[in-house]
Amino acid sequence: MVHIHAEGPAFFCWIPKLFGKRVISTIHGLDWDREKWRGSVASKFIRGGEKNAVKYADEIIVLSKDVQKYFLETYGRETHFIPNGVNRPEVREAKLITDHFGLEKDSYILFLGRLVPEKGIRYLV
């Protein structure tokens, strides 16, 4: 069995099939639609990977319900929804953190995520 992560690498998921291997493709998101790839040759290649995953992968795993819906509506392809998981953090009293960093209530905004256009940080700032 071969497990391929992301749409770009999925372009090549037909190769293991030549050797009789089962292929699982995990799609982390619609990479071809990310702002940094839009309108580029890379976007077309990545989209080709998505189509090859649909055509050749024995199973497709997606990380969000929206992507699952997209694959069903666009390709009629059933997928397995397995969300990313995290360990629950230790709950601390907010006062411990605000006192430590000298923060006042309603005087700050916290953003956790990659600094990439699709996260929309420009709307937050």
Label every PLM stretch briefly.
Residues V2-H3, K55-S64, H80:
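A short beta-strand/loop micro-motif in the catalytic core of glycosyltransferases
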Residues I4-P9:
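Short His-centered aromatic/hydrophobic patch
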